[in-house]
Amino acid sequence: MFYLDTHNILYLGSCLLASVCTLCICRNRELFPHISENKPIGQLYRLMNIHKYESFSIIIQIHHLNLKFGDDDNAKFIVHLKIGNRYAYTHYHKQYQNKVHIEERKNMVVKQNNNTLRLEVYKKGTLKNTFFGSAEIHIYSEIVKKLFPCNVYFNITNKNQIVGTACLSFHYINLDCIKKDDQIYTSLFIETIISVQKNQTKNNEKIEKLIDEGKEHFEAIKETDLSTTIYKNISNLVLEDKIRLFCKNLNGYLLHSNFYIKRFYNKYYFYLHFFKGKFYWCYYNEEADAKMDKNRVGYVRLEYVANVYSDVYSHKYFYIKYRKKNERKENYLYLKTIDKDRNIWVNIIHDFIILVSNYKRERKNKKYKIKEFKDNLIEDTPKEILEINKTLSRSLSNNSMKNKYLDKKKKVEVLSDMDNEENYMNSGDLGPVFKDMSKNMYNYSD
């Protein structure tokens, strides 16, 4: 006989609870950390050659998708990236002539027990997204062994049928090397490291030599890692040299408009000029004009930029809020990306604004210290020595480049009078004079 007493009820309840718990654990076992995530156990796994690599950060750049079956030109697609229990998603992108331009970059972490990177493509529907296809990328054989390749194509399959290809790039960056003080410029560091890594044929030769000597692929990559050396070199630079290096990250093509109307956009090449402690983010019709600072369409002073905003409604648009010198009115610069992720542009400009403000603060402190030092010197030095210093400075200023330039200008004005033949005959070659004058033709109003 089965009696309904308290002991039996407790026994049944505990059995039911245990079965529910085991079911939850089985379903969500990926969410639980692997035993190798413990450092000593992880090192033991590496020594026993069970795992081929340590945990590392990877930057995955999704360039575009080539579709074999493109029936609808207005169809939108989204890409899901999955490594273990970590996910990353792109925005929705339109298909045009069986091609989906994405150009988005995702930063992900690969744990040492992760073996595959899964790429899934979904087509946007009215109520629910429909599965289009997927690609399984083996991390060790297709990424680590190939030394983190760029612009590599992977087949997207659906029910053992190839439905398209995905173009991806992989970058290995040791983000742990960046110190706490420099973490506000992380996006600037990442951009410079990636730009160097794109032309790293010599570094690949070093890695191949180490592999031939008997080292594992990941250990060879880690030993010849450029990110730590580049970061050390940049951090040792003076702030002005650091700015000159980071200026290159703000150069590139963008679509520009003065109004919030998404139809009327002009394609310009944006280029950052840095001189006399001022930052001019100029835009030109062509890249060749930017380097020579010719035919400038307009510019924005980065010192007067208040903030950078991402457009809520579209993933390709962003705008900059800024003020002009001696003006209270707020102006907006509406921009659209072409070949770079919108978030990358926003992060770079945001970090650069912080860098500019820090530079200005440092410069102000230096000026204050010099002034304080001069005031102390004047108090200590006698009047006779001060008068000698004044006369010396006047004589040096007379022989300065500025006065030489003005003399040349006067010469040209005199030589323009054709009636005076003596001056005209003794003129010589006026080419260098006009060359010096043409340097200041493109002046800035502020």
From Swiss-Prot:
UniProt keyword Repeat, yes or no: no
Disruption phenotype: Conditional knockout at the ring stage has no effect on parasite development during the first cycle and merozoites egress normally from host erythrocytes. However, these merozoites are unable to reinvade new erythrocytes. Impaired rhoptry secretion during merozoite invasion of host erythrocytes. Increases the spatial segregation between rhoptry neck protein RON4 and bulb protein RAP1, and impairs RAP1 processing. No effect on rhoptry morphology. Microneme secretion is not affected.
Keywords: Cytoplasmic vesicle, Membrane
Domain C2, residue spans: 39-208
Location relative to the cell: Cytoplasmic vesicle, Secretory vesicle, Rhoptry membrane
Coiled-coil features, chain-numbered ranges: none
Membrane topology annotation: Peripheral membrane protein
Biological function: Essential for merozoite invasion of host cells by controlling rhoptry secretion. Binds to phosphatidic acid (PA) and phosphatidylinositol 4,5-bisphosphate (PIP2) lipids and thus, likely contributes to the assembly of the machinery that docks or primes the rhoptry to the parasite cell membrane prior to the fusion with the host cell membrane.
Name this polypeptide is given: Rhoptry surface protein CERLI1
Gene this protein is translated from: CERLI1
